[in-house]
């Protein structure tokens, strides 16, 4: 009965166009009131939102026991937050700003963690999976398993960057626009290119023109 009541409240406030399943826990309903495209198909999912999420951000959750955390003072203007399979997590740290991004955890048990005070530009893609399988012909074993993505604190991702599965980006790093990151990025460094390579070390950055 409790689960049915929760779902009814959410639908009545026009937060969810589709909420099927039970035991889904949404915290921060008042911050989601302008959201126009929200789907949960599963059970036991947790959403904890401490910042306003606008109508141009779509949240899609397929599967069970996923967790989405959006901390305080986050600005997310446009994009998609996408979950598939089960037991995945996306976390966006406090003070982070996102112009537009596609954040995807599409294989079971993976995490996509974005630290505090990050600056994410437009058309950024971050994913823990390739979504499809690449298989070794001789062994029949898949060669591209999913991996976590961890972005540290105070990281700047330029326009149209792609952060691939398994990447860890250190604090204060900068990823130049249109780069494709496939390997770890050291703290206080700039990477650029396809695939991204280190072009400068011993740096930090500031949102202001100083």
Locations of regions flagged by a protein language model:
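Terminal amphipathic alpha-helical/low-complexity segments used for targeting or macromolecular assembly
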Residues: 1-56, 64-65, 117, 123-124, ...
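Conserved catalytic segment of ABC-fold P-loop ATPases
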Residues: 170-173, 186-188
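Flexible, glycine/small-residue-enriched loop-and-beta-strand segment within the central core
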Residues: 48-167, 202-203
């Amino acid at each position: 009965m409790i689960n049915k009541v929760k779902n009814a409240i959410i639908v009545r406030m026009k937060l969810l166009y589709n909420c099927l399943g039970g035991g889904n826990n949404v915290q921060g309903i008042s911050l989601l009131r302008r959201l126009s495209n929200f789907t949960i198909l599963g059970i036991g999912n947790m959403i904890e939102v401490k910042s306003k999420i606008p109508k141009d951000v779509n949240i899609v959750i397929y599967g069970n026991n996923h967790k989405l955390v959006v901390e305080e003072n986050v600005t997310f203007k446009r994009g998609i937050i996408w979950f598939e399979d089960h037991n995945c997590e996306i976390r966006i740290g406090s003070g982070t700003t996102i112009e537009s991004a596609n954040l995807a955890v599409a294989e079971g048990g993976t995490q996509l963690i974005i630290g505090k005070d990050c600056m994410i530009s437009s058309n950024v893609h971050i994913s823990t999976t390739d979504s499809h399988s690449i298989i070794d012909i001789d062994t029949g074993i898949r060669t591209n398993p999913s991996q976590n993505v961890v972005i540290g604190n105070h990281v700047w991702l330029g326009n149209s960057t792609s952060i691939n599965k398994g990447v860890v980006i250190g604090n204060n790093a900068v990823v130049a626009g249109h780069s494709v990151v496939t390997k770890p990025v050291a703290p206080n460094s700039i990477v650029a290119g396809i695939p991204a390579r280190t072009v400068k070390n011993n740096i930090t950055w500031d949102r202001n023109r100083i």
